[in-house]
Amino acid sequence: MKKPALRCALFMALYYGANAVYQGYISKFYQQSGISGSRLILLLVSFPLLSILSQPLWGWASDRMPRRNVALLITVGASIPLLCLLGLMKGYAGMAIVSCLFALFYPCVQPLGDSLILQSLQESPIPYGRVRLAGSVSYALCSLAAGALLGRNYRAMPWMAAGMLALLFGGALLLPPQAGRPHTRIRGGFWQVFRLPHALPLLGLVMLLQAAMGYFYSYFALHFTSLNGGRGALLGWAYLIGSASEIPFLLLGDRLFDRFGAGRLMLVSAAALTLRFGLLALVRSPIAALAIQALHGLGFVVMMLCMAKYMSRVAPPALRGSAQAVISMAGYGISRTFGVLAGGFISNRLGSIGAGFGLMVAVCALALIGFAPVFLRLPVLNGKNS
């Protein structure tokens, strides 16, 4: 790898390593802290809900700064002490306040980082998928390591994640500097992102699929460890299998994107997620749940690679940070808020997290049926002919 691509890959590895610790075990941290029922749902939903505000604001700020890297450094730097504070909290009120503050910074790291990396790779022969591969490998290894190190002491999770974020801050310092456009004004500003070619149907499909993924990321750890024999260390293996399953697509994803485009590839995601969540709703064995994780490689990573590359190609330079923020706002903030609330309500009413996965089957099937006629009729959406 050339030096800029190597620095970008290092950032990806550190970010997804930190995210493996936080995202994979936050629900177990809350559960071990005595939080359950509606209070657990409120804590889990506050994070994506507040990111609906924070992500577009930081995306806009990044585009207006002389150096776009500064916004990334601020969001990573602020997240570290907030995670440490979360580790000190004992009661629900303190956790709720810190979680809300954390949501103003940490969810913005991924879209800001993606925007900088995609811009850095424009003149590089190294495709984005190869760089993103470092993130999947790191997520797999760190998930396994975190599961083994935490054991049943999930209260230690914030400290472990904060340590990973400290390393990530160093990785962010090494990213190639990218100039913002503080004096460029585009009529309509941030809202112009929604007027980019085919942005609305693509974002609509992503929102539905990410709603289902939001339920998975929030409740899978609780569901898995509730199965007979579903230990914390085995949960780490589940995350490892899921991350490893992303590798084939990341090796081929750039070529597949150019050939089939974002819309058609995400229809494959819709079909795979319908099957995946249908199986998760039915199985009662942790070994079967481990096997189902092999379908993970056709879900999140396909959506994010396709949307990141498409928006990077069609957005003007002064809107690139905002464009990535919109992807994250729609695909994370809005959709995961729905996934956590609706899925949590159903699982609470029926007394089973598996029932929530049944609802997500309906969401993914609706996405597939509703958007297949749209994207199969349109030309290939790869940003070159849009």
Q: Language-model segments: which ranges?
A:
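Helix-to-loop junctions at the C-terminal end of transmembrane segments
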Residues: L53-R67, L150, P248-A262, S347-N348
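A membrane-interface helix-boundary motif in multi-pass transporters
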Residues: A148-M164, G344-A365
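Helix-loop junctions at membrane interfaces in 12-TM secondary transporters
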Residues: K3-A5, G87-S99, A281-I292
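Juxtamembrane intracellular "pre-TM" segments in multi-pass secondary transporters
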Residues: M1-K2, L175-V206
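Helix-loop boundary and gating motifs at the non-cytosolic
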Residues: K2-P48, A199-V206, Q210-A238
